[in-house]
Amino acid sequence: MRLGTLLCQLVLASATTSAKWIVPGARWRATDGSLVNAHAGGVTRDAGTGKFFWFGEYKVQGQEEGGGVSVYSSSDLVTWEPHGLALEPIEGHPHISNEDIIQRPKVVYSEATRQYHMWWHADNRTYGELLQGLAVSDNITGPYTYVDATAPLGNWSQDFGMFVDQKDGRAYAQYSNGDRREGRDVYLTSFNENITALDEVVHRFDKYDLEAPNIVQTDKSYFALMSHKTGYRPNNVVAFRADSLSGPWSQPFIIAPLNTRTFNSQSGFNLRINGTKKTTYIYMGDQWDSNSLWESRYIWLPMEINEEEKSLELVWHDVYDLNVETGEITPIEGTTYYNMEATTTGKAYHQEATFASDKTIVTGIYGNDSKATFHNVEGSGKPQWVSFYYQNTDDMGFGDQPGGTPDRINGTWQLRRISSVIVNNKTEELQTLYQRDTHKGIILSSPLMLNLDKGSHNTITIGGLYNGHDYKGADIDRIVVYPPEE
C-alpha cells in the first residue's frame, strides 16, 4: 500500500469516527475506525442510560451468514462504539453455528425475567427449518446465551421483526412464513408477558407475499412497513395503516418516490424518537450489495407522517443532523456543481436528458480513458462529504415480483457500477464509488468522504472501475459538496 493511500484512509477514518451527521448510504465507521457491521438488525434504547444499542448481522468476506450478532452503542445515533459480538456462533451447534442462518436480530428487555431477550430468524442454509431463535443476557451488550429455536405456534417463520407497543408495553413479533405455496403471509403475533414465547395471532396479512416487516407507531396510527420478495435486489417498500393492531388494515401503498426502489433499500427497522420539541420517526433500511454482502450499507431517513391524510413518506436528505434530545432534523446545505460545468475525455460526453437537473447528463464514462472532471470545486482543507447524483440503468427492468430476470436474455445480474473518484489528480488516493442500479430517468445519489484542499482550485475526476462485468461508471448528473463536520 502506498503511503499516500494509507494517509488518506487514516484521515477519512478519523473524520468518520467523530461524525456528527447521518449520511445515508455512506461507509459508516465506528469509534475504532472499523466499518459498522450490523446488517438487518434493530436499535434498542436502554431506559436507564438513554443510550441506543444497535444489533445486527455480522458479515465479512467469506462468512456472509452465520457470523453472529454484533452490537454497538451510541448516545446520538451517529457515533457508534463497538462491543463485539453479542451472540457468538458455536461450532457444531444445531442452530447458532457458522453454518446456520442467524438473521434479523432484535432485542427487548423483559421486566418479568429482568433480562434482555434477543430474537431472530433461525434457520439452516437451505431455509428448510424457518424457526425463531431466542437468547438471553443480563447485560444489554451480552454475551447472550442460547435458549431455544422454535416454530411460532407451529407455523413457519422467515424474515423477523419485533415491536413494543408504547401504549401498554406489550411486545409483538412480525414474521413472513416462507415462500411455500401454503405460506406467503405475514403474521403479527403477540408475545406472552415474559417475552419467552408467542401466544396469539393478532392479524395475518394474507397472501401479500411480503417480507422484512416492521411497525411504526404514532399517537393515532400503526403503519406496517414491508418489502417485496426480490432477494437482495431493492424494491418499492409498501406500508399498511390501521387504528388498531388487529385491524382493519388498509391496502398497501408505496412509501418512497416511485421507481426509486425505496432509494435502493429494504425495510428492516424503524425508530421513534420522542423529542422535547417533536416526535420523529426514522426509517432504518439496508442497502444490500449482493455481489459483496459485507459491503452493504445503511439507509436511515426521516419519515413524514400525515395523520389526516393517513400517509407515510420517506424524505431524502444526502446529509442531515438529528438531535435525539429535541427530535429535530436539520438538513445540511451543500454547494451544487452541475455536469455541464464538467469536462469530459475519451468517449464520455454530455447527452440531452430532460429528467436531469440541467437537462443534460454525462454518459459514456468508462475505465481510465473516458472520464468527467469537475473544476473549481470549493474545499475547506478538511474531509467533506460529497454526494454524486447519477443514473445507472444496467438492470433497470426488474420489478417487485419474486425472482425476476436481468434486462438481457440469458444475462446475469449486474446491480451496480463502481466509479473511481480522484481529487486533484492524486491517483494514489483514489476512492471507490458504488452506484446501484436505477430505473431509466431516475436520479439517485451516492456519497463519499473526500479530502479537498482549501480554496476553489480543486478538481474531482470520475472514471470507471471493474465491477465484475466491465469498467463502466454511471451517468453523472451533478455533485453536491457539503461543509466539514465541525
Where are these regions (language model features)?
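Fungal secretory targeting signals
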Residues: M1-A19
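A short pocket-lining beta-strand/turn micro-motif at the edge of beta-sheets
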Residues: S221-Y222, N235, Q266, T276-I282, ...
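Short, loop-centered acidic/histidine patches that primarily coordinate divalent metals
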Residues: I273, M284-W288, L465
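Extracytoplasmic
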Residues: N323-E486
